[in-house]
Amino acid sequence: MSVAFAAPRQRGKGEITPAAIQKMLDDNNHLIQCIMDSQNKGKTSECSQYQQMLHTNLVYLATIADSNQNMQSLLPAPPTQNMPMGPGGMNQSGPPPPPRSHNMPSDGMVGGGPPAPHMQNQMNGQMPGPNHMPMQGPGPNQLNMTNSSMNMPSSSHGSMGGYNHSVPSSQSMPVQNQMTMSQGQPMGNYGPRPNMSMQPNQGPMMHQQPPSQQYNMPQGGGQHYQGQQPPMGMMGQVNQGNHMMGQRQIPPYRPPQQGPPQQYSGQEDYYGDQYSHGGQGPPEGMNQQYYPDGHNDYGYQQPSYPEQGYDRPYEDSSQHYYEGGNSQYGQQQDAYQGPPPQQGYPPQQQQYPGQQGYPGQQQGYGPSQGGPGPQYPNYPQGQGQQYGGYRPTQPGPPQPPQQRPYGYDQGQYGNYQQ
């Protein structure tokens, strides 16, 4: 009826002026208000009358719009939408006479809009996953995906998983935020450099390590890893260049190095230890926090991140990442170097070499510290140095564990620390 009624109206109107359309829109707005009032007062009869009038106007407006676009075929559609929307959606839509438009757009927007965000998140997440670099860029969304990726990588890495979950101190979204923060913070501080460097490293790391895959996963998976690990890697490299960063990062490496053997032995446990021990650097406290779980520790570290500050967080991040990464690496190495872990540092070195990405990173470190093999000792040593720096920061108790696990490294630590 409404359609039939609208068409005659349109024909009867003849010329359609903007003023007439605006007036009708105003009338529709008034009708909507009346409908809402009627609904509130429980006057269903009046409400239905207003709805019919409103629907008629909307159909008419839709017809005008369609006729202007030569899309008479769509005429039925607006009425259909208008009917429901007019009575229901429109009434609630509120004054806007365009309610129909609103409703339709709302529907489209609501339907499409949210999907878009989701898709964006997915795409972002996906992109970040695939494009670790995007992660660095997009950070949050990508981080989200990254987190997802991290979670997966972490799942793959277990430690990472813990790490991711831990990292997600915020956990899940927070993780993203934290990760974002971690990346943002660490990356913000180191991130930019790490990111840029990292990207190169990333490529190298990713390429360097088939384990890198794991590493990548750390990067990709722990895309903060990526963001930071590579940065760590970079930082390790760059930072080793910058021993401070190197120290921070290296300590993580070191713990992994130190930890790796044990990590390898019981990376998870070792994680706890490593993180407790390996994390002796500032991470120690933090790592211990993180590492107590190894995962929660991360979560804690992230909290620590904020607490420690970007530098520390970065260190922690680096350590996390590295340790996390190392953990990953360690774990990865486990996978890679399950045997090497047993072998010990050299094996670890080998493991890292196995991870070659890691050695690459070590190389990054190595350049600072020396060849991969030597790096490794250097690494531990470098870490020792850096770690020493850390160690002072960290409580002795964790250190002793490191010492125990890393009696060898500790010597280095001692040397470096000195």
Curated annotation (Swiss-Prot):
Record keywords: Acetylation, Activator, Chromosomal rearrangement, Nucleus, Proto-oncogene, Repeat, Transcription, Transcription regulation
Ranges of Low complexity composition bias in the record: 225-251, 328-337, 345-366, 376-393, 404-418
Signal peptide stretch: none
Residue window of motif SH2-binding: 50-53, 374-377, 413-416
Stretches for region Disordered: 77-118, 188-418
Extent of the Sequence repeats: 344-356, 357-369
Start-end of Pro residues biased regions: 394-403
Top-rank lineage group of the source organism: Eukaryota
GO molecular function: transcription coactivator activity
Reported disease: A chromosomal aberration involving SS18 may be a cause of synovial sarcoma. Translocation t(X;18)(p11.2;q11.2). The translocation is specifically found in more than 80% of synovial sarcoma. The fusion products SSXT-SSX1 or SSXT-SSX2 are probably responsible for transforming activity. Heterogeneity in the position of the breakpoint can occur (low frequency).
Subunit text: Interacts with MLLT10. Isoform 1 interacts with RBM14 isoform 1. Isoform 2 interacts with RBM14 isoform 1. Component of the multiprotein chromatin-remodeling complexes SWI/SNF: SWI/SNF-A (BAF), SWI/SNF-B (PBAF) and related complexes. The canonical complex contains a catalytic subunit (either SMARCA4/BRG1/BAF190A or SMARCA2/BRM/BAF190B) and at least SMARCE1, ACTL6A/BAF53, SMARCC1/BAF155, SMARCC2/BAF170, and SMARCB1/SNF5/BAF47. Other subunits specific to each of the complexes may also be present permitting several possible combinations developmentally and tissue specific.
Protein task: Appears to function synergistically with RBM14 as a transcriptional coactivator. Isoform 1 and isoform 2 function in nuclear receptor coactivation. Isoform 1 and isoform 2 function in general transcriptional coactivation. Component of SWI/SNF chromatin remodeling subcomplex GBAF that carries out key enzymatic activities, changing chromatin structure by altering DNA-histone contacts within a nucleosome in an ATP-dependent manner.
Name recorded for this polypeptide: Protein SSXT
Lineage: Eukaryota, Metazoa, Chordata, Craniata, Vertebrata
Designated gene of the protein: SS18
